[in-house]
């Protein structure tokens, strides 16, 4: 990273170059000492917990991004395409569904800027597993993989299985997803259920595909 930044500076283009450093997913804990660490986050890659999805993102653009600014609003790598297109003035294809949003207000530290995503959905190959809106994240009952016997030195280990009941987490105070608040906030569950229904009608599941479902990975 340092060498890249040095090269930008040496060529006199660092002030007006957007530099993005991020990851596509959390640590693959099955690989043990080569798998990384999720720190205070729950689980890792392959799950719908924060350890699988929440990743660091560092952006540098001296001409546009305020030095030392921090953003805690929800955004993801899918937002890079529409954001970069907007920056360079390129129109997005009209015949494709683009899931990402333009997050320039968040990048530029604009006062009062909020996440453009009303909801963020968590899917598995079988269908919808959870939904997040703002500070609240709801997960439906499902089974998930955990490292039963982590590997070592680049070799993967063995998976075990765990299950979770209907769960509600307040990520503003419990980023580790340790306190299930589902029974305490039925009104929040109801709100998130209404958002989940939108995704069900749009994407559907493996057994009942929605009008905008598409093959995994596409």
Report the location of each language-model feature.
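Surface-exposed patches in mature extracellular/periplasmic domains of secreted proteins
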Residues: 15-16, 92-95, 204-210
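Loop/turn elements at helix/coil->beta-strand transitions in domains of secreted/extracellular proteins
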Residues: 13-19, 54, 116-117, 133-136, ...
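Structural recognition of the beta-strand scaffold that forms the well-ordered cores
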Residues: 18-22, 40, 57-60, 82-86, ...
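Active-site metal-binding loops of divalent metal-dependent hydrolases
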Residues: 25-26
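Substrate-binding rim/cap in mid-to-C-terminal beta-strand-loop elements of soluble/periplasmic
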Residues: 2-10, 30-31, 37-97, 101-114, ...
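C-terminal, low-complexity/hydrophilic appendages and adjacent surface loops
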Residues: 45, 49-50, 122-182
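Short amphipathic alpha-helical coiled-coil/interface segments
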Residues: 185, 189-196
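Bilobed periplasmic-binding protein-like "clamshell/Venus-flytrap" ligand-binding domains
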Residues: 114-117, 196-212
């Amino acid at each position: 990273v340092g060498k890249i930044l040095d090269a930008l500076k040496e060529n006199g283009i660092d002030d007006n170059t957007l530099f993005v450093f991020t990851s596509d997913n959390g640590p693959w804990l099955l690989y043990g000492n080569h798998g990384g660490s999720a720190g205070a986050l729950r689980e890792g890659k392959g799950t719908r917990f924060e350890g699988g999805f929440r990743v660091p993102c560092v952006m540098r653009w001296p001409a546009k991004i305020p030095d030392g600014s921090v953003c805690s609003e929800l955004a993801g790598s899918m937002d890079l395409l529409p954001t970069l297109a907007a920056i360079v003035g390129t129109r997005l294809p009209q015949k494709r569904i683009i899931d990402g949003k333009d997050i320039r207000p968040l990048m530029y530290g604009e006062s009062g800027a909020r996440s453009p995503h009303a909801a963020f959905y968590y899917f598995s190959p079988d269908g919808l597993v959870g939904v997040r809106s703002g500070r609240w994240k709801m997960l439906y009952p499902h089974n998930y993989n955990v490292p039963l016997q982590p590997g070592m030195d680049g070799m993967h280990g063995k998976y075990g299985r765990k299950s979770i009941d209907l769960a509600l987490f307040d990520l503003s105070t419990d980023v580790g997803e340790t306190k299930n608040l589902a029974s305490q906030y039925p009104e929040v569950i109801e709100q998130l259920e209404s958002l989940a229904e939108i995704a069900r009608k749009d994407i559907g599941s493996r057994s009942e595909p929605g009008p905008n479902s598409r093959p995994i990975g596409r």
